[in-house]
UniProtKB/Swiss-Prot annotation:
Tetramer of two alpha and two beta subunits. This is Phenylalanine--tRNA ligase alpha subunit. InterPro entries: aa-tRNA-synth_II, aa-tRNA-synth_II/BPL/LPL, Phe-tRNA-synth_IIc_asu, Phe-tRNA_ligase_II_N, Phe_tRNA_ligase_alpha1_bac, Phenylalanyl-tRNA_Synthase, tRNA-bd_arm. Mg(2+) binds at residue 254. It is found in: Cytoplasm. The lineage of its organism: Bacteria, Bacillati, Bacillota, Clostridia, Eubacteriales. It comes from the Bacteria. PANTHER family: PHENYLALANINE--TRNA LIGASE, MITOCHONDRIAL (PTHR11538:SF41), PHENYLALANYL-TRNA SYNTHETASE (PTHR11538). It catalyses: tRNA(Phe) + L-phenylalanine + ATP = L-phenylalanyl-tRNA(Phe) + AMP + diphosphate + H(+).
Amino acid sequence: MRQKLEEIKNSAINELKASLSKDQLEVIRVKYLGKKGELTQILRGMGALSQEERPIVGKVANEVRSYIEETIKEAFSDIKNKEKSIRLENETIDITMPGKKQAVGKRHPLDLTLESMKDIFISMGFTIEEGPEVELDEYNFEALNIPKNHPARGEQDTFYINDNLVLRTQTSPIQIRTMENQKPPIKMIAPGKVYRSDSVDATHSPIFYQMEGLVVDKGITFSDLKGTLELFAKRMFGDKVKTKFRPHHFPFTEPSAEMDATCFVCNGEGCKVCKGSGWIELLGCGMVHPQVLRNCNIDPEVYSGFAFGFGVDRMVMMKYGIDDIRLLYESDMRFLNQF
């Protein structure tokens, strides 16, 4: 029996030395130490031995078992270390090689233009005011002198949440909130998103950006309005840009006007973009209607003011020569990477 145990030990050692993988080690373990393994069978047969042989053989069998278990454990560790070394060698990074450049995004042309517009007005002493995009009917229409039956209040032009709440159609409500909460003199701009129930095409979008401005003080005249907007146009588009004012109608200003600028495509020569006129509509403006001032508890006999409003998307298109507003919202990297 002792000779058989020595044979098992030597056989196991030889097989372990020749093993190259964890799977082979597991096969050897099962062969000798498993439930039906060779060493296990000998241990189960010890009952047939004499009382004198049993403790001697049992001691040798346990020593062989412990030796095989320890040898398998060491072999597992050696193979694991070899695999780790091979993996590290294959995964070695050459730190002298140039790294991969991180893809860095760029600022959107809308954001760039908004910042330029803000900077110009801030340099002229304007403050920036904000307000909610979900607005009360009172602020979006009533306080701006837009009556119940006005066409702009129809569902074809306005997104209604309920009878009293709308998605703001302009940033003018911010002007009302500012006049309610601040005393003149007031000199502010209100940039932000607005919503109109428009079909999407090259010049229309249901969501777009607008910037409105308001000045209220004693002795404000249309000349102040004209000078402010002409200065803005020159700083935004260059000293060569020309502007002109045309009479218009807005319910919240009186008198009202629209300001045109020389076409950014043809420089005033006439083209398809400006329909041959050499001019492009830039903004709406006018003197604040006396009733709007009264609605905000400002006495129109003491104070006067002017207001104006830009479509920021239109400004972007003019500044960069873009002929389709949809390009600003489609997240096409071929387009956005140009800025």
